[in-house]
Amino acid sequence: MARYTGPVTRKSRRLRTDLVGGDQAFEKRPYPPGQHGRARIKESEYLLQLQEKQKARFTYGVMEKQFRRYYEEAVRQPGKTGEELLRILESRLDNVVYRAGLARTRRMARQLVTHGHFTVNGVRVDVPSYRVSQYDIIDVREQSLNSVPFQIARETAGDRPVPSWLQVVGERQRILIHQLPERAQIDVPLTEQLIVEFYSK
């Protein structure tokens, strides 16, 4: 299955949640697209679980097969499966770049990582799904610092709050990972228990 590259607002409307963050088109029409978008539909338990799983997938830009692997890894962890799943998703490098305010959207963050603009602990990483660990240090590469996306990020620093589990330092926009996030530090509008129930069937 190919990665979805179509209009994200349409997916946001279908799943009734802002998958981008600050999507003005979604705010104007927060109901499903199509002729019968405003109609009230009785939602089954399965549909609610499926929608929650899809919300998580599209929020973090993860394909179904990879998302399933994340879930299976979360099951093996000692904590609550749903919380472990969110922690895995939050620790992706593209998400960390987004959370740090160096990209306006996760999709943009993914592109910046893919283009090789970052190092992790001094090693260049161009894999968006790379998982960061506690005490990792993420730097913008020297030759990338003056490119337009990072100039904009410096000018707009502070517009979006940076979560307390990471820190952005100075003009070099270094990201320090103090810890991996707890559930209370993850502000995505997801009910992770519904995802667990979906895969538990």
Swiss-Prot record:
Matches recorded under Pfam families: Ribosomal_S4, S4
GO biological process: one example: ribosomal small subunit biogenesis
Keywords from the named record: Ribonucleoprotein, Ribosomal protein, RNA-binding, rRNA-binding
One Gene Ontology MF term: rRNA binding
PROSITE patterns linked to this entry: RIBOSOMAL_S4 (PS00632), S4 (PS50889)
Leader peptide range in chain numbering: none
Chain ranges of the S4 RNA-binding domain: 91-157
Keyword ATP-binding: no
GO cellular component: small ribosomal subunit
SMART domains in UniProt: Ribosomal_S4, S4
PANTHER family: 30S 40S RIBOSOMAL PROTEIN, SMALL RIBOSOMAL SUBUNIT PROTEIN US4M
Assembly, per entry: Part of the 30S ribosomal subunit. Contacts protein S5. The interaction surface between S4 and S5 is involved in control of translational fidelity.
Described function: One of the primary rRNA binding proteins, it binds directly to 16S rRNA where it nucleates assembly of the body of the 30S subunit.
Family label: Belongs to the universal ribosomal protein uS4 family.
Protein name as catalogued: Small ribosomal subunit protein uS4
Upper taxonomic lineage: Bacteria, Bacillati, Actinomycetota, Actinomycetes, Mycobacteriales
Gene, per the UniProt record: rpsD
